[in-house]
From Swiss-Prot:
Source organism phylogeny: Bacteria, Pseudomonadati, Pseudomonadota, Gammaproteobacteria, Alteromonadales
InterPro entries to which the protein is assigned, alphabetical: Kinase-pyrophosphorylase, PSRP
Catalyzed reactions: [pyruvate, water dikinase] + ADP = [pyruvate, water dikinase]-phosphate + AMP + H(+); [pyruvate, water dikinase]-phosphate + phosphate + H(+) = [pyruvate, water dikinase] + diphosphate
Protein name, per record: Putative phosphoenolpyruvate synthase regulatory protein
Source species: Shewanella sediminis (strain HAW-EB3)
Keywords recorded for this protein, A-Z: Kinase, Nucleotide-binding, Serine/threonine-protein kinase, Transferase
Binding residue positions for ADP: G150, V151, S152, R153, C154, G155, K156, T157
UniProt EC number: 2.7.11.33, 2.7.4.28
Gene Ontology terms, MF aspect: ADP binding; ATP binding; phosphotransferase activity, phosphate group as acceptor; protein serine/threonine kinase activity
Record flagged with keyword Zinc: no
Function recorded in the entry: Bifunctional serine/threonine kinase and phosphorylase involved in the regulation of the phosphoenolpyruvate synthase (PEPS) by catalyzing its phosphorylation/dephosphorylation.
Similarity comment: Belongs to the pyruvate, phosphate/water dikinase regulatory protein family. PSRP subfamily.
Length: 270
């Protein structure tokens, strides 16, 4: 039976999930996780406590409980359960109070509320990215913070969306397709915004596998075509001095981190 894990918060539980995932990923085992957001009342906290205790009775193992709860009275109820508590927020609050010389003033939903001053900026970035996905238009390319380039299915769209959703970056993307390969060059609008360009590449065999799952037995998905496109695009990156990274076997989070590291783009945290 898998070890039970609870992610609990009086907000969205995103912070507890991210922290918990980061810690548990260090161990080569699987876990049975349950996320419980918006534990905002003592009554709900008691319900959660019962779930944790029932899990302990059923399995004989104390559940791992990662939480980020602002209100002390609710937090204390979770503390009193049979779970093993890992309190992300309050582990660091007391030491920081000493260093900063002030008391914390906790507010529920401060980290993930719509009132957050960066909310509108993030929505604006997401809308921009969706409107400028896959080379739909180059009219507003000058408003981009970043333009991702690459062959079809190399990871441009998920990387663009992740950057806009997580960091408020206006990330357009532009594809190079089979018809471009005979005379591969940058469109004028991209040349005029060259400082914003960043390339993605991928192992041709991996690209072949991805395309096969979408359009099997086609020229588009053939290994030969994948090799041609990757080779031509990488040569163009080098010729135009466009920085690029290989996305093969990397998660969207890793790709985005590499892009931010190379470009120096500012991360807007919300």
């Amino acid at each position: 039976m898998l070890r039970k894990v609870f992610y609990i918060s009086d907000g969205t539980a995103i912070t507890a999930e991210v922290f918990g995932h980061a810690v548990l990923s260090q161990f080569p085992v699987e876990f049975d996780a349950l996320t419980i957001p918006f534990v905002e009342t003592e009554a709900k906290a008691h319900d959660v406590k019962l779930q944790i205790n029932d899990c302990f009775i059923t399995t004989g193992e104390r559940p791992l409980v990662f939480h980020s709860i602002v209100k002390a009275e609710i937090r204390d109820i979770i503390y009193s359960s049979e779970g093993l508590d890992y309190d992300f927020l309050n582990t660091f609050v007391a030491p920081l109070e000493l260093q900063l010389g002030m008391k914390a003033s906790p507010v529920v939903h401060r980290t993930h509320g719509k009132a957050n001053e960066g909310y509108e900026a993030r929505i604006d970035a997401i809308n921009y990215t969706m409107d400028n996905d896959d080379g739909q238009t180059l009219k507003n390319i000058d408003k981009a913070d970043l333009v991702l380039l690459g062959v079809s299915r190399c990871g441009k769209t998920p990387s663009s969306l992740y950057l806009s959703m997580q960091f408020g970056i206006k990330a357009a993307n532009y594809p190079f397709v089979e018809d471009d390969m005979d005379n591969l060059k940058l469109p004028t609008a991209l040349k005029e915004n060259k400082s914003k360009l960043f390339g993605l590449t991928i192992d041709p065999v991996r690209l072949h596998e991805i395309r096969k799952s979408r359009m099997d037995n086609s020229r588009y998905s053939s290994l030969r075509q994948c090799r041609i496109e990757v080779k031509e695009v990488e040569m163009m990156y080098k010729r135009e001095r466009i920085p690029f990274v290989n996305t093969t076997n990397h998660s969207v989070e890793e790709i985005a981190t590499k892009i931010l590291d190379v470009t120096g783009l500012e991360r807007h945290m919300f």
